[in-house]
Amino acid sequence: MFSIVLALSLVTQNPVAHHIAEGDSAGLMHPDVQLHHYQAALAIDSTSYEANWKAARAISDVAKQILSNADSLKRRRDSLYAVGRVYAERAIRADSTKPDGHYVLSMVLGRLSRTKGSKERVKYAKIIFDEATKAVEIDSTYHLAHHVLGAWHAEVKRLSGFQRFFAKTLFGGGFMDKANWNDAVMHLQTAVRLAPDHIYHRLELAEVYVDLGKYSKAREQLQAIAALPVADVQDPKNKEDAAALYKDIEKEKDEK
């Protein structure tokens, strides 16, 4: 009885912390439940650093599940990412010395950019790079930010000549020239080393190895994925994608 009274007292004293804790306990397999609690915390204190960055992550995890190209669903997905950007920017305003706000802004815009055409994707490139870099500068072990940076290098290297010309016109000649395959591999390898059970780290690294013709290394990552437990709402789809990619490259020989 005393423990129940104590718990109710703590909730009354700090309802923001209570909602954040409830969101955390829902886990990454239930981002919709997480988002409900983080938004409840923000309804009480819209400046909460923790509630804002976690709400940005959760709403992005809800949005990433919308894979349809139907116009109404694309608008829904983009609107969720737009709200996620607001949350991430509020988190940075609340405390720019911590890495999470910088990471979630880079992540939200990175995911949004992958749903857009080439010109719009290029427009987000500098913010994504700068914010992920800040997160890693603050915490060099932030594996999720390393993933964003690795993906950034790979995505820029995959741009066509025209797209890179547009990027240079927008940002100046030097910025997009930062992108290189070595850093794509290095950051994604770092992400895998720091979080070896993270399925999407390994999948993205495998895709980069395929780009580079390093099929044996890609297969190593894809085989590892098959044995990993599901931890994220998108992991079942990631596992399917990994299995399909493995089948596609199963007999490929490494390029010299």
Task: Enumerate the language-model features and the residues they cover.
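Sec-dependent N-terminal signal peptides
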Residues: F2-L10
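Cleaved targeting-peptide boundary
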Residues: S9-A21, E255
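Terminal, low-structured helical/coil segments at or just beyond the last alpha-helical repeat
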Residues: P15, F162-G172, P196-I199, R219-Q221, ...
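Short coil/linker segments at helix-helix boundaries
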Residues: H18, E22-H37, A58-T97, L105-T141, ...
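Glycine/small-residue-rich hydrophobic helix-like segments
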Residues: N182-A224
